[in-house]
Amino acid sequence: MSCYICGRGHHAQRLPFLCPIDARNRLYEGRLAQAHTLIDSDRLKQQTNALIEQPPPTAAKASRSSPAARKAAIDDWASKHQEAIDRTAEIIAQADRLKAEVEAARQEIRQRKKTLARRKSDLAEAADGIEEKRKKQLDKVKDNIAATRADWDLVHESTASNRAFLCMEAARLYGLRRLKKGSSVKYELGGAEVVDLHALTGASPQAITISFSHIVHILNRACQYLAIRLPAEIILPHADYPRPAILSITSSYSYNHDDIPYPGTSDQQSELNTLPQDDLFYQRLPRARPLFIDRPLPVLAKEDPAMYSLFIEGVALLAHDVAWACCSQGVPVGPEDVLHVGRNLYNLLIGNQLLRGVSSNDGGNSTPQMGRYSHGAVHSYLGSAEGSDLVRTFRLPNPIKLADRLKSKLSSDAPNPDWELLEDDAWT
């Protein structure tokens, strides 16, 4: 080993020691030789002591030749022999027990294998039977479902036919007719002519009010029969509400009719001022659109522009409701035909069913489209995914845009007076 002081490796002959480490390394050989000598001396000492402790051979022979020693040796051998026999017998018995246990275990294993094989065969047979039985039960359930669905479809078709029949009979009892004179076509309801929305400017207030009153009554009755809910809620006359009105689409079906203020012919704010202003409920009440007027439309537009706008909005909402009801019952209505309320109402309640009756007599599809979709049955429910897809195909114009279009049409058709009317005090 090298010295950690001088850093030189030790060599006994060539490099003398210069420090304690080198001296210690020089002494290692002597120490190792002394250790080997001590080990050899100890081994020789042990061998000598073992030889000294052994008895002489003559004494051993003498001890074995004495009778007592021979008897003791024989007894010792006999006891050892008996012990060996007993131990052998015990080992043989233990072996027999182990053989019996092994044989019993093998027998149990064979029995279990037989049982498992039998169970597997039984399970295979049962599985084949269960699969067949399950298939039969599944087919039976499918047949029952198909039969139930077919019965359900038949009941729904019958219900739709009854709905259509009730609507047609109600329209006929109410006097809904189509009158054709030359090239002009007019519609009559309740003995009064259904006003043309494009000619409201020239119609009298009584004719407009009566016509809209009849329309909302027959439309509400038809919606009850068809179990549909119109987008814009109609308020029929009731206590303290002598004339019909209509709500906007966003305000419909959210409030009780008794809580909604009556839209009088003057500004509605006078009635709203009588309500408790500290109650948030009354502040949020919707404003109903009137479906009646008490003066000619040009006069109303000049004297009460706010009431005129509300009335036009109500007319547009009513036309939108009629068109929506037609589309939901399979009666096509184009975007330009929404304002033809009389024609749409007649086609919904009478004309469309007459056309379907003719097509069924010619061998066409006899399933009535009217009455199929509704809000009152799970079958063909208008609130389902299928019904929502149907509603998205209507493509009806927005009531606000419809009101603007009607307002512009009426303003363009309004007659311009040739003379300016002056009050009496203007001559003084």
Swiss-Prot record:
Component of the autophagy-specific VPS34 PI3-kinase complex I. The keyword Transport applies. One of its GO terms (biological process) is autophagy. Keywords: Autophagy, Coiled coil, Membrane, Protein transport, Transport, Vacuole. Required for cytoplasm to vacuole transport (Cvt) and autophagy as a part of the autophagy-specific VPS34 PI3-kinase complex I. This complex is essential to recruit the ATG8-phosphatidylinositol conjugate and the ATG12-ATG5 conjugate to the pre-autophagosomal structure. ATG14 mediates the specific binding of the VPS34 PI3-kinase complex I to the preautophagosomal structure (PAS). Plays a crucial role in hyphal development, conidiogenesis and pathogenicity. Also required for glycogen mobilization, quantity of lipid bodies, and the turgor pressure of appressoria. It comes from Pyricularia oryzae (strain 70-15 / ATCC MYA-4617 / FGSC 8958) (Rice blast fungus). Disruption phenotype: Leads to the formation of sparse hyphae with necrotic centrality, and a reduced number of condia. Fails to penetrate both hosts in infection assays with the two susceptible hosts rice and barley. Also leads to delayed mobilization, reduced lipid bodies and lower turgor pressure of the appressoria. Impairs the delivery of ATG8 to the vacuoles upon nitrogen starvation. GO terms for molecular function: SNARE binding. The keyword Membrane applies. InterPro entries: UV_resistance/autophagy_Atg14. It is found in: Preautophagosomal structure membrane; Vacuole membrane. Residues 82-143 form a coiled coil. GO terms for cellular component: endosome; lytic vacuole; phagophore assembly site membrane; protein-containing complex; vacuolar membrane. Its main location: membrane. This is Autophagy-related protein 14.
